Design a protein with these regions (language model features):
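Nuclease-adjacent, charged terminal/linker segments that flank catalytic cores
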Residues: 1-48
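Catalytic cores of nuclease domains that cleave nucleic-acid phosphodiester backbones
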Residues: 46-137, 165-169
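Metal-dependent nuclease catalytic cores in nucleic-acid-processing enzymes
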Residues: 150-169
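Short beta-strand-loop-alpha-helix junction that forms the active-site gateway
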Residues: 142-149
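Acidic active-site catalytic centers that drive phospho-/nucleotidyl reactions
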Residues: 128, 141, 154
């Protein structure tokens, strides 16, 4: 075991326990459920230049898509394929949440300014795939139309939430 990643292991193991706040991931469609989902939140951020890279992960994802019999099955096919065939993939569908407390930490301790400080409920989501490559944690989210929906806010929330849950500096 690599001591550097014990916090990831602990977080993933905690997910199946009673200690994990499963209730915050139950969305009530009638009560503004979209307000608490990371995938639905948009906010102002620095201009980000998109750099597209091709790597082994891209190649594996293309192979995985061949296993899907329909568009609906693509997401699950990629996750299953990566978990089985990619040694850097350590988990799929990892539930993650960012609380007002977390947002306050980023504002007061790190000087971040973003419009999530007074959100009514925890902002939640599920990281499609989590990988550890070259000593770094990678968060992957399958978006077939990423160019249209621009998921940077969602991935930023996931990274910030994961950083708080793992006490990363």
């Amino acid at each position: 075991e690599n001591p550097q990643f014990l916090d990831i292991k602990s977080y993933i193991e905690k997910i199946s326990s009673k200690q994990f706040p499963h209730h915050i991931f139950t969305y009530n469609r009638n009560n503004n459920a979209n307000e608490q989902r990371a995938s639905q939140i948009k906010f102002e951020h620095l201009k980000i230049d998109h750099i597209q890279k091709q790597n082994r992960g891209n190649e594996l994802a293309k192979l995985a898509l061949n296993l899907a019999k329909s568009n609906k099955e693509r997401h699950q096919a990629i996750q299953d394929f990566m978990l089985i065939n990619d040694s850097t993939t350590i988990a799929a569908e990892v539930p993650i949440y960012l609380t007002n407390w977390d947002a306050g930490y980023y504002r007061n301790q790190k000087g971040f300014i973003f419009p999530l400080n007074n959100h009514q409920t925890p902002i939640t989501g599920h990281i499609d795939l989590m990988q550890v490559r070259n000593g770094l944690i990678h968060i992957l989210d399958y978006k077939p139309e990423a160019d249209k929906i621009k998921p940077i806010e969602q991935l930023t929330i996931y990274a910030m939430a994961l950083s708080r849950k793992l006490n990363l500096q």
